[in-house]
């Protein structure tokens, strides 16, 4: 089992892309890995909460995969911003008719979704979540505690520090699907109250020091 820091993960991402793997392909692989990691997708409604960066992009790519599989998936945009790759997959979702809600504009009944996927803040986030993201984190945690929603965090629980496991406010998950490599923060004491099951999916990201 390989465990690396957030900065090492960034370096590995850059290295893999520089060697010729397109970033959109890595995002697609991440989404497919999340889809394959959870065997419980069924006819139940799924809400995917997406933030502004590549973590949100993973959510958009996952929504496309789920739509293609005939599943009942809805996107929740928590930010008006996109990463370049995220916007690419968002547009594909819209073209395929995936329902899209915008937090703060549309009414969102979190209790209506038995499965909620957290794709808001990635491993690069530090500090305390603010604004709509903080509000959605709280709503997800309430839905899990009071309504029994099954919560899946993609790559990391939104709000958690990837190196230390610490958080001011973070999503509590039933399953966290790490992408590429486990991050050091997952195994620190503060993270234990946030993470239920933990799995990692290999999407072909190479560590620079492995090359010689």
Regions found by a protein language model. Give the residues of each.
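An N-terminal, well-structured beta->alpha segment
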Residues: 1-49
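Conserved active-site and cofactor/substrate-binding residues in soluble primary-metabolism enzymes
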Residues: 4-7, 21-33, 57, 84, ...
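YjeF_N-associated NAD(P)HX repair module
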Residues: 1-4, 10, 16, 113-212
């Amino acid at each position: 089992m390989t465990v690396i820091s957030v900065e090492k993960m960034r370096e590995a991402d850059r290295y893999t892309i520089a060697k010729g793997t397109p970033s959109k392909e890595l995002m697609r692989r991440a989404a497919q890995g999340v889809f394959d990691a959870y065997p419980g997708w069924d006819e139940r409604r799924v809400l995917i909460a997406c933030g502004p960066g590549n973590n949100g992009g993973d959510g958009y790519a996952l929504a496309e995969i789920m739509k293609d599989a005939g599943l009942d998936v809805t996107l929740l945009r928590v930010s008006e911003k996109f990463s370049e790759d995220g916007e690419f997959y968002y547009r594909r979702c819209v073209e395929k008719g995936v329902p899209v809600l915008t937090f703060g504009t549309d009414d969102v009944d979190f209790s209506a979704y038995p499965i909620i996927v957290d794709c808001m803040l990635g491993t690069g986030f530090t500090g305390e979540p603010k604004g709509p993201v903080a509000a959605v984190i709280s709503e997800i945690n309430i839905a899990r505690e009071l309504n029994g929603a099954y919560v899946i965090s993609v790559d990391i629980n939104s709000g958690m520090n990837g190196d230390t496991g610490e958080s001011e406010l973070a999503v509590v998950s039933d399953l966290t699907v790490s992408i590429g490599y486990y991050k050091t923060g997952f195994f620190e004491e503060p993270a234990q109250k946030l993470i239920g099951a933990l799995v990692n999916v290999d999407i072909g990201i190479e560590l620079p020091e492995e090359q010689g």
